[in-house]
Swiss-Prot record:
It comes from Arabidopsis thaliana. Keywords: Activator, DNA-binding, Metal-binding, Nucleus, Transcription, Transcription regulation, Zinc, Zinc-finger. This is Transcriptional regulator TAC1. Residues 15-28 have a biased composition (Polar residues). InterPro entries: Plant_dev_regulator, Znf_C2H2_sf, Znf_C2H2_type.
Length: 172
C-alpha cells in the first residue's frame, strides 16, 4: 500500500484511498471463496452468512417440495390405473391398429394377416407369510401355487446391556 503524505487536496486523498481499498478487495477475492445461494443465486463472502440466508428459503423449499410430491403422486396414480391390466389381447389391438392405418393412409400397405390368438399375461411374484400355531412360518404364493417353507421364528432380544456380552441360549 502507498503511504500518502500531505495530499494537495481532499479529492486526491479519497481517490488514492479508494484505489488502495479496491486493490485489497481484488486481492482478497482471488484468495477467498465465494458462496452462492442455489435458490436465488445471491453471493456471500462466507459459509455462515450463506447458511443464515438459506434459512429464509426454508419455507419456499418446503412449498416447492410439497408441490413436486403432489405432482409425482398424480403421475403415480395415473400409472397405477394403467398398470391394472392383467392381460392384453394382442389380436384385438393389432386389428384396431390395422383398421386405423388402412382408413387413414390409403397409399400404405398394411398386413392384416394376424396369427392365431396371442395373449400376453403379466405375472406377479408376491408372497405372503403366515404363522401357524406351532411357531412356523408358511409362505403362501398369491398366484395359487402352494410352496411352503418352514422356518423357526427367532425372538429378538432388544434389551440394552453394558459391558461384555453374555449369550444365553434358550432350550426348547
Amino acid at each position: 500500500m502507498e503511504n500518502i503524505k500531505n495530499p494537495k487536496n481532499a479529492d486526491d486523498c479519497s481517490d488514492s484511498i479508494s484505489k488502495n481499498s479496491h486493490q485489497g478487495v481484488d486481492d482478497s477475492l482471488n484468495q477467498s471463496r465465494s458462496y452462492v445461494c442455489s435458490f436465488c443465486i445471491r453471493g456471500f463472502s462466507n459459509a455462515q452468512a450463506l447458511g443464515g440466508h438459506m434459512n429464509i428459503h426454508r419455507r419456499d423449499r418446503a412449498k416447492l417440495r410439497q408441490k413436486l410430491m403432489e405432482d409425482n403422486k398424480d403421475d403415480v396414480v395415473a400409472e397405477s390405473d394403467a398398470s391394472e391390466v392383467v392381460s392384453l389381447d394382442l389380436n384385438e389391438q393389432q386389428q384396431q391398429q390395422g383398421e386405423a392405418l388402412t382408413c387413414d393412409d390409403h397409399d400404405q400397405y398394411v398386413d392384416n394377416d394376424i396369427s392365431p390368438k396371442q395373449k400376453l399375461e403379466f405375472w406377479v411374484q408376491e408372497s405372503k407369510l403366515d404363522t401357524n400355531d406351532h411357531g412356523k412360518v408358511t409362505e403362501a404364493s398369491i398366484d395359487g401355487s402352494s410352496s411352503s417353507h418352514h422356518r423357526d421364528i427367532e425372538v429378538l432380544d432388544l434389551e440394552l446391556r453394558l459391558g461384555q456380552s453374555v449369550v444365553k441360549k434358550k432350550t426348547t
